[in-house]
């Protein structure tokens, strides 16, 4: 009976998922007109104090943007991006406190 109880308790441990990037707008590798916002949507709610994103141009220069983290998304508000290539680098932490990092690129058309 004790073995059965121990087996049941071991099987009942919580399953933790990580806050992985589910979608982005603009999408990775997309060519778009200058976007008013960049939205990253994750697979679970984020810990705002430990999640964020940065935007850089093709030369790697950081582009200043307003940022918002709430629920399962990160929103960047760029101001008039010029034509060219851009890279979004993000980091997310969900309720399991595991940090995930990633990036994607997109192009702004003339």
Spell out what each predicted region is.
Residues 12-14:
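N-terminal signal peptide c-region/cleavage motif recognized by signal peptidases
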Residues 17-25:
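Cleaved targeting-peptide boundary
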Residues 27-31:
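Short beta-strand segments of immunoglobulin-like
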Residues 33, 37-44, 97-110:
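Extended, polar beta-sheet/loop recognition surfaces of beta-rich domains
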Residues 65-70:
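Short beta-strand segments within Ig-like beta-sandwich modules, predominantly Fibronectin type-III
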Residues 82-88:
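A glycine-anchored, Pro-Gly-centered beta-turn/N-cap motif
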Residues 91-95:
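Beta-strand-rich extracellular modules
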């Amino acid at each position: 009976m004790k073995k059965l109880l121990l087996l049941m308790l071991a099987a009942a441990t919580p399953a933790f998922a990580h806050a992985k990037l589910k979608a982005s707008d603009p999408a990775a590798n997309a060519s778009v007109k200058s976007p008013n916002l960049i939205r990253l949507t994750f697979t679970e709610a984020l810990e705002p104090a430990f999640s964020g994103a940065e935007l850089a141009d093709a030369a790697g220069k950081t582009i200043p943007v307003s940022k918002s983290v709430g629920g399962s998304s990160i929103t960047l508000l760029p101001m008039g991006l010029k034509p060219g290539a851009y890279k979004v680098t993000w980091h997310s932490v969900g309720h399991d406190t595991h940090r995930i990092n990633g990036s994607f690129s997109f192009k702004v058309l003339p």
